[in-house]
Amino acid sequence: ISNNNDSETVKVTPLVDLAITKVVDNANPLFDSIITYTITVVNNGPDASTDVVVKDIWPANGLKFITSTGTYNPATGIWNVGELGSNEIATLTITAKTTAVGKFENKVSVNGTGYDSNLSNNNASVNITVPDCVILNITKVATGGIVSEEPNKEVIAGEKITYTVIVSNYGPSVATNVYLTDLFNDDELLNMEYYSNGNWVKYNNGIALGDIDVNEAVMILFRATVNHSTRGLINNTVRITTDIKDARGNFEANETVKAIDNSTLVINKTSNV
């Protein structure tokens, strides 16, 4: 009779359903702006899952980690969630800065102990698109025809004056269809010209500079004749535009000179006899 009973230990694997989602508060952020990702993990049960781990795979470039909640390690991309009971939810937020333009995908995945009855919801991804951006700068300096620097740059009425304009693009995108406009009083500055392809060309309402590459600087020379009857301050302004919507920086530059009569110049000459 002693051999009429038997026993066997059966290990029952917990049944779980881990699911993950990831969203971003702004899918079209501007360059150098802050965005926040929210990762949500839920265990739909019916049993608890232990050692739940989330892997957050960042793009190789385009985003810089700023801060996060929870036990997220930005160096490894691992978030150790720990145990999730049936119908329990865990949430992680990650704040980042956009550091490039373009489209960037961020992927996440989750796994833990137990038999996961639905693997299709263990992965998620979210995309952001950072539009083109340019940081431009323009300067204008009177560099020719100046006879005195203090207290104002002085030019002689009736003589030529030359201006040097420099347009710089600091990126991160190519500045497309850049257009330059020179604003001046044509009663004060006569016969305004700019230098192009080895020739002086009459200025007429504006100059199409075309595209300016990242870290490229374009120099434009202008020259004009100061009206012989002009006296006092002469202001000259240049402006630039581009068809890049997110354009930043300095789009206008001014230069002021003082027109004087030739007779106001004083020449000191010392001779030894």
Please name every model-derived segment.
Residues 1-273:
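Exported/extracytosolic protein signature
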